[in-house]
């Protein structure tokens, strides 16, 4: 990986310009173990993953204007392109794959903010986004001898919001967003959808030394037209949100928090209209979320300058949940609705910093999640849908977590990170043949920053997946084993 900060220059007292870019290339030909059966005594062989090359390029530039403490402007331009091979699932005696995927994306966005007075603040933004994707499978057994699909999408977006501070501890805001999305492709009888979206939100917030309350209502209006076939239809939805945070002890940063949120999610164009993926019969996803939690933070002493912990329990009721299943490769998934899902879980996080010496700092953090996500669509065991009643939904582990440890010194920085995921199922039916083992990943890195002439330079070396295990996040798609990555960052 090579990353370079090309420019960050203050033009005058009001304007600053910046630009940076990144390029990455990898053949991705990593070894893995192919199992000839599910039993431990079955044969295995060492193979090499093929058609896994990746090349990416990213560039962006920004212009920042600070006219005063109460007036700012931002402009950003972005470009990204990539090409990658799409390896097939690891099946016996057939690892041939020549499928390729090319992506391009560019956008320009701007933001303006003006504080007219202590009471009134105005903010607006605009964005134009263009994306292109080309998918090629040269081995398709059809009259053309291949599948070659190209998709083009554009978005035009405008938003405006106003904030009114009625009192020092009471404020209200009104915001509205409008967007037009279009999609086209090189396919016969393609839908050519156009989506008109209008979202308006009214929100209020009250806060004092011991209590914070926020509430909002979001009105969503969606109109969608197509030139061919069926569309996702038109939708009208009003979704509320309310949250509260209570601080019972004046001298301690201990808080009790709660929120309720109603969520409405419309399927994306990719979900609906991609030939290999899309399902125009997808229904919008609706969810009701309830959350209650505790947070605590403290500066204990000079040796322990920072300590924090959070724990949250949540309950979600989701109807028409949009889920995806992988098929022949990681770019082609099958989309469908799952009638009703009940989710219960606990999230816990913790972090602390130790300062044993003035210029040496140790940072530790971690998080843990327990999540029960059950299909409760149909309780009749005599039906096909009833076979998965109260089963964990596919690719959703009950337990997962991660952790980080780092040491900062004036000479070199060292860090260690890990993540783990418990057992999952590749289908909604929780039976032995659908089970996937859990996995863990451990990585370490060292880095150093220094100045050379007028540049700020940093160098880092990472050893990824130090246990060298080809674990699978998606069944039959093994991840790379141990690898080393070096990064050079030069900032002018």
Which ranges hold each PLM region?
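Predominantly transmembrane beta-strands of Gram-negative outer membrane beta-barrel pores used
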Residues: 3-42, 60-64, 311
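Transmembrane beta-strands of outer-membrane beta-barrel pores
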Residues: 23-27, 79-83, 128-132, 178-184, ...
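Flexible loop and strand-edge segments within Gram-negative outer membrane beta-barrel domains
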Residues: 26-30, 37-39, 46-56, 64-122, ...
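Short loop/turn motifs that connect adjacent beta-strands in outer-membrane beta-barrel proteins
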Residues: 13-14, 69-72, 115-121, 165-171, ...
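Gram-negative outer-membrane beta-barrel transporters
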Residues: 168, 210, 308-317, 334-428, ...
